[in-house]
Design a protein with these regions (language model features):
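Short, solvent-exposed loop/beta-turn-alpha elements that line the ligand-binding surface or hinge
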Residues: 16-46, 75-105
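Periplasmic binding protein-like
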Residues: 1-24, 56
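Selective for proline/serine-rich intrinsically disordered segments
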Residues: 12, 67-70, 89, 96
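Bilobed periplasmic-binding protein-like "clamshell/Venus-flytrap" ligand-binding domains
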Residues: 3-6, 48-84
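Extracytoplasmic/secreted proteins, especially bacterial periplasmic and envelope-associated proteins
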Residues: 13, 36-43, 52-59, 63
Length: 105
């Protein structure tokens, strides 16, 4: 079986992508499951220490990559031409921009 799908991160955090592999996640369309993966993601969600959280996500990602339940084939890229007279615009990882902060010189 093969399926093509797309996902754009809802927020700037590894969990926005890695939580998709959790067994009972409604967006886990592959029905993939791994006994060590789910607890790692759950621990990372509860952990306050950023370094520990990063390590947990890193370990979970290694499992995901070794199993390859999904195969990324492309990623979104956005190009913008911003006139130098526009101020208050800045690039954003989530491609969201507070246009109320824009101004013209």
């Amino acid at each position: 079986d093969i399926l093509r799908a797309a996902w754009f991160g809802d927020y700037n955090d590894p969990n926005t992508f890695l939580s998709l592999g959790v067994t009972d996640n409604g967006n886990n369309h592959t029905n993939w499951s791994h006994p060590r993966y789910d607890p790692l993601i759950e621990q990372a969600a509860r952990t306050q220490d950023p370094k520990v959280r990063h390590k947990l996500f890193e370990e979970a990602e290694k499992i995901l990559i070794s199993q390859m339940p999904v195969i990324p084939i492309y990623f979104y890229v956005t190009s913008r031409l911003i006139d130098p007279s526009v101020t208050g615009w800045y690039p954003s990882l989530l491609d969201t921009h507070p246009y109320q902060a824009l101004d013209l010189k």
